[in-house]
A protein has these predicted regions:
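Conserved N-proximal alpha/beta basic substrate-recognition cap immediately N-terminal to
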Residues: 24-149, 297
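Active-site nucleotide/adenylate-binding loops and adjacent lid/helix of ATP-dependent enzymes
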Residues: 103-223
Length: 379
């Protein structure tokens, strides 16, 4: 009996798909995608023109424009991420750019998934079984409650809709001089307050100031699940966050073994066999509790059967528990999955997504009216 409402909705949706209104909605979505492509082209071209005008170290503006036309790459991807300037066309085609991945995400990631993952509190509530730390909203507590929360443990303050580590800072009670102004700042900015957790010792020693999270990229639908790739993100320079945008470094993890077999890399394509600050070896490092981390991702993916893509940020804690920190419904493929080894994953993505989703996701990149049926995620 429980499946009857779902069956009824599916039947009604099938009827709706035969109507002229549905076709018009798909046409609107296609026009939106076309607009996005043109805007990307303008922005990327302007950035590249400025960089080449300053004296770019490699390649040429003409070659970049050709790469942009064919593969929708940014200047960063062309110059540093994938080093397109040194590749022939066959080698370039092995990579999938961030813009191409975003095109896929727009078309097949559902609105429910987007809304859940974009809002940090909605995510924490939906995936509560995998979150062990305390948290609260600054604008949802009094001054006294705010102070008691901070005095109980160090706190990380985050914007609700922040990305790339922007706007994140750490609060230590011993360093607070004006509680009222700090509370007002957090409350007025609607910041999320989270208890600071400690990673297990092997992870922590890499860079003690930051948590050093593990990003696991998964593909899933229903009971189907696979780990597509993973990387260890480490802070640097004493930063409390481990994002590359804040100067952090990252290293790809072998999904089969949980080991790091190759050097880490930063946003400027510098490679590190040892951490640049602590000198702790990175190559040969084995992620503690790797099997439990993968199993946590598998269980979390089942919470939303139509999740499809996810980038899970996790960390094994000092007590052995696996802590889910954040999630991303549109994980980057341009970082740890392709850049460190300069090896493209386009064909691997086609094969893995075909097994999980039953479609050729590379077809979703093509901007033709023939792909109208793939624009449902934008409605």
């Amino acid at each position: 009996m429980a499946t009857q409402p779902v069956q009824n909705r599916n039947a009604l949706y099938h009827i709706f798909k035969q109507t002229a209104l549905y076709e018009k909605m798909l046409r609107w979505a296609w026009l939106q995608e076309t607009r996005i492509r043109e805007e990307e082209k303008r922005i990327f071209t302007r950035e590249a023109r400025e960089q080449f005008g300053k004296g770019a170290p490699h390649g040429s503006f003409a070659d970049y424009k050709d790469a942009l036309r064919r593969h929708r790459v940014t200047y960063q991807e062309y110059m540093y991420g994938y080093e397109y300037w040194k590749l022939d066309e066959a080698a370039r085609d092995a990579f999938i750019s961030r813009s191409e991945m975003q095109c896929i995400y727009r078309k097949i990631v559902t609105r429910e998934v987007r809304q859940t993952f974009r809002n940090k509190t909605a995510f924490l509530e939906r995936f509560a079984p995998f979150v062990h730390r305390e948290w609260r909203m600054a604008d949802g507590c009094s001054m006294e409650e705010f102070r008691a929360f901070v005095e109980a443990h160090d706190v990380i303050a985050k914007p609700l809709d922040g990305t790339c580590g922007e706007g994140i800072f750490k609060i230590c009670a011993s360093e607070v001089q004006d509680w009222e102004s700090l509370y007002a700042r957090c409350r007025d900015r609607h910041l999320l307050l989270e208890e600071c957790v400690r990673a297990c010792e092997p992870i922590e020693q890499l860079h003690p100031a930051s948590l050093n999270t593990i990003r696991v990229v998964t593909l899933s639908q229903g009971d189907k699940f696979t780990v597509f790739g993973a990387l260890l993100r480490m802070g640097a320079g004493g930063s409390v966050i481990d994002n590359t945008h804040a100067g952090g470094v990252f290293a790809p993890i072998n999904p089969e073994t949980g080991c790091i077999d190759t050097p880490a890399i930063d946003a400027h394509n510098h490679h590190y066999e040892r951490h640049p600050d602590t000198d702790v070896p990175i190559v040969g490092f084995t992620i503690p509790y790797w099997e439990q981390i993968v199993e946590t991702c598998r269980k979390a993916a089942r919470v939303m059967p139509d999740l499809r893509f996810a980038g899970w940020d996790l960390c094994p804690l000092a007590d052995g528990r696996i802590e889910l920190i954040e999630g991303n419904h549109a994980p980057d493929f341009d970082g740890g999955l392709q850049a460190p080894l300069k090896v493209g994953v386009k064909q691997k993505l086609k094969e893995s997504a075909g097994e999980i989703f039953g479609i050729n996701v590379l077809e979703l990149i093509k901007p033709t009216s023939k792909t109208y049926n793939h624009y449902e995620g934008m409605l």
